[in-house]
């Protein structure tokens, strides 16, 4: 039962531009390099292997900005980003020490707690939701108040049903008032072909831009907070909780990684042109798409709750967990302090 709940978002890009990116899978099962570390510029060198949630894309702009502009070098870190052959396995790859860190999804941390995986979120990469209800500009669906009688494309993830139920409740609709169709990873093609009236699971800063480039019109985008879904951190940095406790060198390297990520995030936000050029070199999107996606993404790296860059609000995690429980995604409530911490990022 847990296996079907594990993946909060398997990154629903079935468009050709994403699939053209070469999958980097060599060495998935090798041990992380580790290494003794100290702190900052005088620290012993360390290497960290980081499993990405999906192919490199503008959601990772801060990571690649750090990589290409010396922020990891300043922390005496060598960082390798890898798209694993199974992008849904990020937490298990860290739990089994096959990767040092993973970029993954907040919702999955609650599932990991119920599976007793030794993982913990240590920093926020994208501190606000990117998921959305999306429709073409001329769709019958123009917002949550127009979903009655509509066909909504979903990927078959448990969160899809929870989001749909939240929409139905907010509009006083019965289950059969809105039809959902499982289109797997083909959300964008399903929208473009007219197979569905709208879709859940599309990132407005990525798929929204791609749809606009295909149709010449801005799609209808309804963000999660407008649908009644509590705010959450879309992408987080995940470490091995047991290793953090037992290996001081690993814990120090993780902290230095987070410091570099935060510094690079702030620098990237102040260098839109440089960030655009940086992502052009690291993704397979068209230059035109990157020139639109990156400016849309950079502001999303700022917390909606006024938190310092990279930091978590455990209160917000608690609220999101309660929403998951109320939508039958969890068997019991999970204490957010057991799955997320600010202890490894100075300034939180």
Whereabouts are the PLM-identified features?
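Hydrophobic helical h-region of N-terminal Sec-dependent signal peptides
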Residues: 13, 17-19
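Bacterial signal peptide processing site
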Residues: 27-30
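Pocket-lining segment of extracytoplasmic ligand-binding domains
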Residues: 107-108, 186-189, 195-283
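Secondary-structure end/capping motifs
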Residues: 247-327
């Amino acid at each position: 039962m847990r296996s079907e709940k594990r993946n909060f978002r398997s990154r629903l890009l079935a468009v050709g531009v994403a699939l053209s990116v070469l999958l980097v899978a060599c060495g998935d099962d090798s041990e992380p390099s580790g290494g003794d570390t100290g702190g900052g510029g005088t620290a012993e060198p360390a290497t960290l292997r980081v499993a990405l949630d999906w192919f490199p894309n503008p959601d990772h702009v801060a990571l690649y900005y750090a990589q290409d502009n010396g922020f990891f070098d300043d922390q005496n870190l060598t960082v390798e980003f890898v798209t694993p052959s199974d992008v849904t396995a990020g937490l298990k790859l860290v739990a089994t020490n096959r990767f040092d860190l993973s970029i993954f999804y907040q919702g999955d941390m609650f599932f990991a707690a119920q599976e007793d995986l030794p993982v913990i979120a240590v920093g926020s990469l994208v501190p606000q939701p990117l998921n959305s209800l999306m429709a073409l500009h001329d769709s019958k669906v123009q917002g949550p108040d127009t979903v009655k009688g509509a066909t909504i494309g979903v990927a078959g993830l448990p969160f899809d049903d929870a989001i749909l139920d939240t929409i139905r409740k907010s509009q006083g609709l019965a289950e059969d008032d809105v039809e959902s169709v499982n289109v797997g990873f083909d959300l964008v093609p399903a929208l473009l072909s007219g197979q569905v009236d709208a879709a859940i699971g599309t990132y407005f800063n990525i798929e929204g831009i791609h749809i606009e480039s295909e149709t010449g019109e801005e799609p209808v985008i309804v963000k999660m907070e407008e649908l009644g879904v509590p705010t959450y951190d879309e992408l987080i940095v995940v470490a091995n909780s047991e290793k953090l406790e037992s290996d001081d060198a690993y814990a120090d390297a993780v902290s230095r990684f987070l410091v570099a990520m935060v510094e690079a995030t702030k620098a990237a936000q102040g260098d839109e042109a440089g960030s655009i050029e940086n992502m052009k070199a690291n993704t397979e999107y068209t230059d035109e798409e990157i020139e639109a996606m990156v400016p849309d993404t950079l502001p999303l790296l700022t917390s909606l709750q006024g938190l310092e860059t990279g930091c978590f609000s455990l209160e917000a995690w608690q609220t999101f967990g309660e929403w998951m429980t109320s939508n039958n995604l969890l068997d019991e409530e999970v204490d957010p302090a057991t799955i997320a911490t600010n202890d490894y990022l100075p300034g939180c």
